């Protein structure tokens, strides 16, 4: 009888001792809530110094007139009435749209290919995704520049497309934008295309629906939220691209990102007012793309929950 009594005494002593230990830990945790706030102070400093403060400066510059130095919309009026700036906005939007369409088609081809082709294509895309910016522009210059390898081959064998290809203009920019858009489009769109079910095709075939009806009345409406959300990401990615375009054409082609840089780093004098207005226009386009992506992402999530 003595051994059970001793064991019970040990259990009671451990239980009594455990309560104060647990209570002390809880009190310690309650006493140190400021530790969590201190941990995120560096993050807030980075956001304020490198995002909010420059954005506030850009917004202020954009509403201070370059000539009158008064608050107003003088800079925005200049942006949307000067042919150079309107052409820059249009060129950026047009090149972005073209690259998005071609990247979309490439992603669709990859999703329909056999597993062997898809794996090989994905392996190539993984290498392509790590090759962008200035190295990408330099590689295209070596291949298709005025004295590039493919250009010389085109001249030697009388291939007009290669011999007369203008790398330092619209065609060259579109080709390079497509190059760095295809990997991102494929990675983002393959999961969306994987949502196409065989039952949809079987049901459409039973109901004698044409291929056009199958795609435009069944597949695209069901995948539209995912597709449009991804396309908005691709569009914003191309719209804000700077390093590759600058390394290739510098300021010799009208693009929105290049014009913003030229306003702040002018050869003769700077124009922070117009540059700020152009930057706010670019930010507005990016915000629209982000809102579109968020909206369609939520719709796609609701659709998956319903299914």
Show where each model-derived region lies:
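Membrane-water interface segments at the C-terminal ends of transmembrane alpha-helices
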Residues: 32-65, 81-163, 168-193, 222, ...
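Cytoplasmic juxtamembrane regions at transmembrane-helix boundaries
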Residues: 108-124, 192-213, 301-307
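C-terminal transmembrane helix and the adjacent membrane-cytosol boundary/short C-terminal tail
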Residues: 7-12, 19, 37-39, 53, ...
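Short, Lys/Arg-rich, polar N-terminal cytosolic tail immediately upstream
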Residues: 3-31
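Amphipathic cytosolic juxtamembrane alpha-helices at the membrane-cytosol interface
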Residues: 28-33, 170-172, 196-229
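Glycine-rich helix-loop "coupling/hinge" segments at transmembrane-helix boundaries
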Residues: 65-69, 243-270
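Loop-to-transmembrane helix entry/capping segments in MFS-fold secondary transporters
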Residues: 119, 204, 270-276
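A short amphipathic helical element positioned immediately N-terminal to and/or at the very start
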Residues: 71-80
